[in-house]
């Protein structure tokens, strides 16, 4: 559903953010 899509987007954003910090 919509909520699952939102959670997936937030997860991707968080992962990208963490990756950017570590690099």
From Swiss-Prot:
Principal place of residence: secreted
UniProt key word Secreted: yes
GO (cellular component) term, any one: extracellular region
Keywords tagged on the record: Amphibian defense peptide, Secreted
Subcellular location: Secreted
Its job: Has no antimicrobial activity.
Protein name, entry field: Dahlein-4.2
Organism: Ranoidea dahlii (Dahl's aquatic frog)
């Amino acid at each position: 559903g919509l909520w699952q899509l939102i959670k997936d987007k937030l997860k991707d954003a968080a992962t990208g953010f963490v990756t950017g910090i570590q690099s």
